[in-house]
Amino acid sequence: MKTFKDNADRTWTVTVNVDSIKRVRSLLNIDLMEAVEGKLIERLIGDPILPCDVIYCVCKQDADAKGITDEEFGRSMAGDAIELATTALLEELVDFFPQGKRQLLRKALAKLETLQEMMLAVVSERLDSPELDAELLAELRKLGDSSGASRASSDSIPVP
């Protein structure tokens, strides 16, 4: 069992088992067993809303006991809470599978995390580059040159 805190400072326990997998299937029409194929993990990492929906379904019994609706849960999920919750879900999902599949899923998850870190580093490097600054400045100059070139006459402006 993995835990995370939402932005309302509530602690949630994520437990992936047959019951929670069936609940996610029933409520969201998402089969967590498809994690083995890899596409589901990519979707869970790439779409911050999807893991929140899945986690709510996984934690639904706890949410119902606390009187927390799907909407209230969603309002308490943003930023780091989503990342922590997604990590808890993915780790629990990996641990659900038997040893052979679990090893493959751990490798796939590690690859995706490495790829994500590399992507962030490349984007950060690009944003810090003087070349980007020069390109943006050149585009701004083009806009400045073209904006003063054609002025509408006051006759073409409708009077209210």
How would you label these PLM feature ranges?
Residues 1, 11-13:
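Broad gene-expression machinery/nucleic-acid interaction feature
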Residues 1-3, 26, 30-49, 61-160:
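Charged interaction scaffolds used for protein-protein
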Residues 6-10:
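Glycine-centered positions within short beta-strands or beta-hairpins
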Residues 15-18:
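A broadly used, surface-exposed interaction patch
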Residues 21-22:
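N-terminal pre-domain segments used for targeting or regulation
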Residues 58:
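P-loop NTPase catalytic cores that bind/hydrolyze ATP
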